[in-house]
Amino acid sequence: MRLKRIAALTASLALVASATACSSSSSSASSGGKVTLNYGIWDQTQEPAMKQIVAAFEKQNPNITVDIQVTPYTDYFTKLQTAASGGSAPDVFWMNGPNFQLYASNGQLMSLSNAGIDTSDYPSSMVNLYKYNGTQYGVPKDFDTVGLWYNKAIFKAAGVALPTANWTWADFQAAAAKLTDKSKGIYGVGATLEGQENYYNTIFQAGGTVISADGKSSGYDSAASISGLEFWTNLISKGDSPTLAQMNDTAPYDMFMSGKLAMFWGGSWDAVAFAANANTKTNADVTVLPEGVKRATVIHGLANVVYAKSAHPDQAEKFAAFLGSKQAADIEASTGTVIPAYNGTQQAWVKAYPQYDLQSFLDELSYAVPYPISKDTAAWNALETSNLTKAWDLSESVPTAASQLTTQMNAALAKEAQ
């Protein structure tokens, strides 16, 4: 899913305090007793699929009832932080990469190492994303990669050949210039200030890094990372993308949906909305991202985790394991909302929208790079936005903005280690 930028959390201290101040509210019910589990999720679009999965689980486990609690993503982690600090978080809930280490490091998640989960059933990048200090805390639910969505009608009108899987950065940049027609309000691409969909991908394609493998230092000031950032600022300066101010007024996502953007770097999750839109339903298609110095795309995905203070740990663990089963994955895939993480179940998702080449998102798995995270990802996510905004609005050079970001990010990472 698209990971919206959020302000730096103050959750660390609250979660640390709650880790020692609270304990499980009660012991797990006996094997013969009836229990109700609370299941926290944030996407209403996926609720129908989750209800089907819950129904299948309850049929197999008549003594367990699962109550799905949907909280909008904008409020989800704020409410979860409060609930976890007070010992009342859902028994099982969705977790994403940027927040995972914060909760795992503060003892809020239950180890699933003994839940009978075969981690070879999922992409290794997703398994490792939800592992902390060698312990598995999350069961991979789904994953997403980023592809090049494009408007076939705009390409045809401009006489430009459609993108292929062999496109390079140069091919993409040349097409963006030819497709831009400001007299019609059409731009080649929207260079949004988004890491997951845009600049993380080009940083990795240029051979750069966002954060070091040990999570202790920023990679933004390397020549390769700067090249990956300039990929986007150059498109803005040349006029092949709207300005940052224009994109703040009208998001490129909306421009693409309305036929005013020829190309859009977007996720596998966008298929649902594009298929429901009158314009993109028939005019859009997708292929793999263009190749830079090398191929790369960001991979991210959600996991189901168990609250360490659940009153029903055995039942919660059992439900989490079921959520990671092939049966649950098949249900998710059939709805077409997300790519299920369980290996071998993805083709049903591909077939859900035959008008699009969704296989492209799976073809990228061999070179996918995990979404960059640390113990307090949100702290330096905020620094990315504040510093790179100056480069995106062209008021500051990319090397200068990257240098300032590196200094501030290194300080934030050093604070994590204290």
Where are each of the predicted segments found?
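Hinge/lid segment of periplasmic solute-binding proteins
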Residues: 97-147, 283-286, 350-354
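Conserved C-terminal helix/tail region of periplasmic/extracytoplasmic solute-binding proteins
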Residues: 156, 162, 237, 366-418
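Extracytoplasmic "Venus flytrap"/periplasmic binding protein-like
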Residues: 56-124, 157-159, 255, 259-263, ...
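C-terminal lobe and pocket-closing loops
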Residues: 269-281, 292-386, 415-417
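Short, solvent-exposed loop/beta-turn-alpha elements that line the ligand-binding surface or hinge
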Residues: 110-124, 165, 188, 208-227, ...
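Extracytoplasmic/periplasmic solute-binding protein
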Residues: 137-141, 146, 156, 170-218, ...
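Glycine-centered hinge/linker elements that transmit conformational signals in sensory
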Residues: 176, 216-245
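Short, low-complexity disordered leader/linker segments with a strong preference
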Residues: 1-38, 59, 407-418
